[in-house]
């Protein structure tokens, strides 16, 4: 049973009724044309329309995507990963997401640099490499915020360990755990990945390669 979702007071979110259907495990990145909506609890109080950076997939590797959102709260930015359909332009870029289409972001909680991300049970429908990609998308997006250093995950309020490329399963992860999943800035497959995106990707890659200590 999911714990009660705390609704962000900064903007209204329409609840979309979905038709019940059989659920199968998701092992491939999905295209961005989805209709799921989500409500989340804000982790930071910054409000006002702004541009945020989400991390999506280009041929299975992580690339940044600038997205205009109503505010720059952590819950809003991560919520867009679970419901990217609000930005129709990104659907034409050929980018994908491994975050399962039917999963919901229940809430987020920031405590001393560690963000706890609570997701609905549908997140468990993604398995294998796609699950690791989905976790990496969330971690890279969350750690765009300077006050977030680490991420923990919960499913229906229960702590879960998540896979990393180098450390195996871990209860707390950082962006350093997913450096190997970043796209090569000089070899992105989508022709519409513009120079600004490549520059942002190169900067984040250089920062992580400098600051991350091999384990």
Set out the residue ranges of the language-model regions:
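Bimodal "functional hotspot" detector
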Residues: 1-215
């Amino acid at each position: 049973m999911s714990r009660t979702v705390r609704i962000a007071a900064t903007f209204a979110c329409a609840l979309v009724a979905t038709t019940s259907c059989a659920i199968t495990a998701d092992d491939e990145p999905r295209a961005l044309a989805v209709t799921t909506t989500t409500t989340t609890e804000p982790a930071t109080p910054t409000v006002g329309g702004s541009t945020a950076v989400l991390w999506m997939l280009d041929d299975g590797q992580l690339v940044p995507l600038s997205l205009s959102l109503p505010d720059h709260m952590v819950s809003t930015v991560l919520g867009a990963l679970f419901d990217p359909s609000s930005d129709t332009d990104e659907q034409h870029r050929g980018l994908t997401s491994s975050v399962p289409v039917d999963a919901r972001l229940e809430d987020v909680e920031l405590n001393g640099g560690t963000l706890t991300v609570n997701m609905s049970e549908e997140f468990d429908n993604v398995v294998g490499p796609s699950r690791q990609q989905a976790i990496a998308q969330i971690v890279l997006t969350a750690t765009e915020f300077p006050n977030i250093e680490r991420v923990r995950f919960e499913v229906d309020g229960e702590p879960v360990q998540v896979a990393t490329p180098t450390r195996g399963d871990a209860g707390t992860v950082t962006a350093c755990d997913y450096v190997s999943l970043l796209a090569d800035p000089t070899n992105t497959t989508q022709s519409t990945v513009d120079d600004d995106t490549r520059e942002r990707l190169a900067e984040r890659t250089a920062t992580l390669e400098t600051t991350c200590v091999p384990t």
